[in-house]
Amino acid sequence: MKRIIYILLGIFSLIACQQHELPEQDGCVLELNLSCAYVPVVTTRAIDVDLAITILDAEGKVYKRIPAGKVPDVIPMRAGTFTLCAHTDNLDTWKEANNGRGEACYYASEEVTIQFGERGYLSMSVPMTNYAVGLELPEDFDNLFASHQLSIVSGDRDVEIQEGENAYFDVADGGFTYALSVTNNDGDSHTQEGVLFSEVEKGKLYLISYDYGLRAVSHEQ
């Protein structure tokens, strides 16, 4: 078996325009340009993830909330110091998505000070807060086996995936244990003994690849 680790789906970028004077304008604005850069992995299906914006004032109270997909190019602001949080809307629900397989979750925050009559400047990267596990099988696997599933256990979650699917987990749960179960065309079944992988990091996809011997060959990071 070969385990390959990829950097997962790149990093969202949150970029605001350079600060400059607006002598004839009252109030303040913060200009935002949200973009997503990603590297397709496991499947070529397009990835469409929007960021929401939550702005907190100096006392930690919510000053503004802008839902995902609704972030304008220019956000009117009052002068002061704020914490801008860029995140996906699934901070509390990502584990339940996709029938329990989970989904990617992104979050970052940055303090910004807005001066009266000026445009604010802010540049921040919004990384994934969780990690993913995927499965890769030999090209002719389906010709020899009628079914398969990879069982992944992490923390209190037990998730099953097939090739081409990803399951997402929390780094705080301390890694994962995985085991592949297969049934060949004659109806004979085999389940691999569970293997522990403990050194996990946020923002990565752990792609588990098998040969026909179901043995670990190498592992690249």
List each language-model region with its residue ranges.
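Extracellular and analogous surface-interaction loops
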Residues: 123-129, 170-173
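A short, Gly/Thr-enriched small/hydrophobic beta-strand-prone motif that recurs across taxa
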Residues: 20-41, 125-141
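N-terminal ordered "arm"
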Residues: 18-21, 32-60
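Structured interaction patches on ligand/partner-binding surfaces of diverse proteins
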Residues: 19, 68-69, 90-127, 185-217
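Sec-dependent signal peptide recognition
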Residues: 2-8
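Tryptophan-paired
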Residues: 47-93, 145-202
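C-terminal motif of bacterial Sec signal peptides marking the signal peptidase cleavage site
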Residues: 13-16
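Beta-strand secondary-structure signal
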Residues: 29-33, 83-85, 121-123, 132-134, ...
